[in-house]
Amino acid sequence: MNPNQKIITIGSICMTIGTISLILQIGNIISIWISHSIQTGSQNHTGICNQRIITYENNTWVNQTYVNISNTNVVAGKDTTSMILAGNSSLCPIRGWAIYSKDNSIRIGSKGDVFVIREPFISCSHLECRTFFLTQGALLNDKHSNGTVKDRSPYRALMSCPIGEAPSPYNSRFESVAWSASACHDGMGWLTIGISGPDDGAVAVLKYNGIITEIIKSWRKQILRTQESECVCVNGSCFTIMTDGPSDGPASYRIFKIEKGKITKSIELDAPNSHYEECSCYPDTGKVMCVCRDNWHGSNRPWVSFNQNLDYQIGYICSGVFGDNPRPKDGKGSCDPVNVDGADGVKGFSYRYGDGVWIGRTKSNSSRKGFEMIWDPNGWTDTDDNFLVKQDVVAMTDWSGYSGSFVQHPELTGLDCMRPCFWVELIRGRPREKTTIWTSGSSISFCGVNSDTVNWSWPDGAELPFTIDM
């Protein structure tokens, strides 16, 4: 074969290969177009097949939440339809309390990235329940956890995470800069209330779906503060209580009615002989009931009940089973403040059922240790100390702390009544445990059930001190 023939042969082979390659590319383009057309068309069909099954492997991010799972099928596309939470149902009948969540955040925080927190509380929408908490702008077992026994600082913030999870930078959502706070969902969006600033000029910042909608300035210039638990939403309006004034004497107490983050009405309570702080509130048949802390002179708990027009009634739980801490031994109660061991106090809650009341309280009379639920069938109106049911949830030897109420609406549970629930803060570190340089807490929660339950202890369980404390 002479050189010219070789050139012609090689050229022919190259042209043949090029032609085949071009045909393959055209076929590939046609195949992609047909596949895209089929996928686009299938998205227009409705029915049970439009649920997307996504397989997550190893570590990934889902809706800004870090997930560490393997080969797990998750059904995506949960219905997120907005609806107004009516709040018109009565409380569900219950016989006891079932454990609902436990986050073990202090135990996990000895080795993982977990926030230093206090004042956790829980609130539920019609889709989910979330744990809200006040961070100290620091992580456990880190140098910035030093001195976090302080209540009010510019580093504190209200954040939230899915219920039952240890609060960390990887699963938590920023809500508001705050050292006192509340939050609730009206069925359409989250209302958050965050109070921050100096003691003599603090400001409450109201946000609706993350956007600032209203400001409340301290009117007494004496540590404006709010509930440290969920506010209450009824028929599209949300309600909260704030306190401004002395913690050891008469102060000023205001109820606010809020719609989509905007204040539509407010009143000041006429309660010169009562003291209302850190109220735990819940809806019941369209009204709002709040059970609060008397830090001035009552070892029984004050209450205020009001309707959607803010017409209100006030009083004290009459039972001789006293709910505050410190408190005297159970005995003769009063429908007015019980002055014995009445100074100071701790955030708490109760649920009213007619003349009866479920009382949540520490097991210790003098320190924040242990926790129990007591059913007094006449305790709302009678002053004796007789009760029918006592359920232990934290042993006397283990630390507790604040506690508060939250409810699950029928729109979430599918029940025809309002499910009562509560949470308990399990404080660890200073000032009681002086081997640490920090103060933080984990939490547990329970919900009411109409069945037999169990006495047990669900303590924090962390072994102290940590490495940073050595």
Curated annotation (Swiss-Prot):
GO terms for molecular function: exo-alpha-sialidase activity; metal ion binding. It is found in: Virion membrane; Host apical cell membrane. Ca(2+) binds at D294, G298, D324. Disulfide bonds join C92-C417, C124-C129, C184-C231, C233-C238, C279-C292, C281-C290, C318-C335, C421-C447. Substrate binds at R118, R152, E277, E278, R293, R368. InterPro entries: Glyco_hydro_34 (IPR001860), Sialidase_Influenza_A/B (IPR033654), Sialidase_sf (IPR036278). Inhibited by the neuraminidase inhibitors zanamivir (Relenza) and oseltamivir (Tamiflu). These drugs interfere with the release of progeny virus from infected cells and are effective against all influenza strains. Resistance to neuraminidase inhibitors is quite rare. It catalyses: Hydrolysis of alpha-(2->3)-, alpha-(2->6)-, alpha-(2->8)- glycosidic linkages of terminal sialic acid residues in oligosaccharides, glycoproteins, glycolipids, colominic acid and synthetic substrates. Residues 11-33 are annotated as: Involved in apical transport and lipid raft association. N-glycosylated. Intact N-terminus is essential for virion morphogenesis. Possesses two apical sorting signals, one in the ectodomain, which is likely to be a glycan, and the other in the transmembrane domain. The transmembrane domain also plays a role in lipid raft association. The influenza A genome consist of 8 RNA segments. Genetic variation of hemagglutinin and/or neuraminidase genes results in the emergence of new influenza strains. The mechanism of variation can be the result of point mutations or the result of genetic reassortment between segments of two different strains. This is Neuraminidase.
